[in-house]
Regions:
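Periplasmic/extracellular loop-to-transmembrane helix junction in inner-membrane transport proteins
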Residues: 1-46
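Alpha-helical membrane-protein architecture signal
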Residues: 9, 27, 31, 35, ...
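Alpha-helical membrane-interface segments at transmembrane helix boundaries
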Residues: 31-43, 66, 73-76, 92-93, ...
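Transmembrane-helix boundary motif in ABC transporter permease subunits
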Residues: 43-73
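Generic hydrophobic transmembrane alpha-helix motif, especially the helices
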Residues: 74-110, 117-118
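Transmembrane alpha-helices
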Residues: 101, 105, 137-171, 194, ...
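Short cytoplasmic-facing helical segments at TM-TM junctions of multi-pass membrane proteins
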Residues: 110-156, 184
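Hydrophobic alpha-helical transmembrane segments of polytopic membrane proteins
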Residues: 181-216
Length: 220
């Protein structure tokens, strides 16, 4: 049965009274679990940004590359994270890099697609001026494309962060270890419904904070 709001609130107070306790690898406070999940998200998302943003620029800039890569993106983009995770486990032989790989491959596509669309929508007049001035490809990318593409790029980054946080919860449920996803699954095995409800709110709040942080960066 579902716990009452009062019982859930009492469980939350008790849970957050000591969020960083450590009684061994399989019994750590919710604070540690959130931090471990955020660390994996940071690594997977960071690698996705390092690959996805330059790739998006190249796809948007060169029509031939766009025609070559677009079908592959359309093929891979809809694949569920739960399908990518076994591939990661097979290749890396460990849960942590497999989870990071899953975040990488699932969160890269919004950045690639939005960056490419932004580059394609840069006014042709800007590029004509660049050709007249005989600007190098690097100067075109940094002085013309990047400022014009920035709104699209930031939208892609926001979508990717949301995807990364969504994926890590599912991945950790299957891989185990320390992380908010594993913590939820462990509480389910213990039939601790109060903690599961609390985790739902925690996952939502952390996702909201990540998005607000990116909005703050975008305004600057």
């Amino acid at each position: 049965a579902f716990p009452t709001p009062a019982a859930t609130f009492d469980a939350a107070v008790k849970l957050f009274s000591d969020p960083f306790y450590d009684k061994g690898p399989n019994d750590q406070g919710i604070g540690w679990n959130i931090l471990f999940s955020l660390q994996r998200v940071g690594l997977g998302f960071g690698m996705a940004a390092l690959v996805g943003i330059p790739l998006g620029f190249l796809i948007g800039r060169f029509a031939t590359l766009n025609r070559m890569v677009s079908p592959l993106i359309s093929l891979l983009k809809p694949v569920s994270p739960l399908a990518w995770l076994p591939i990661g486990l097979l290749v890396f032989k460990a849960a942590d890099p497999a989870a990071i790989w899953t975040i990488f491959i699932c969160s890269i596509w919004p950045m690639v697609i939005n960056t490419a669309v932004g580059v394609q929508r840069v006014p042709e007049d800007y590029l004509n001026v660049a050709r007249v001035l005989k600007l190098s490809e690097w100067k075109i990318a940094t002085r013309i494309l990047l400022p014009s593409v920035m709104p699209y790029l930031l939208t892609g980054v926001r979508l990717s962060v949301g995807t990364a946080w969504l994926v890590i919860v599912a991945a950790e449920m299957l891989t185990g270890g320390v992380g908010i996803g594993f913590w939820v699954w462990d509480e389910w095995n213990n039939l601790n419904v109060e903690h599961i409800l609390i985790a739902i709110f925690v996952v939502g709040i952390v996702g909201l904070l990540l998005e607000q942080l990116l909005l703050l960066v975008a305004r600057r």
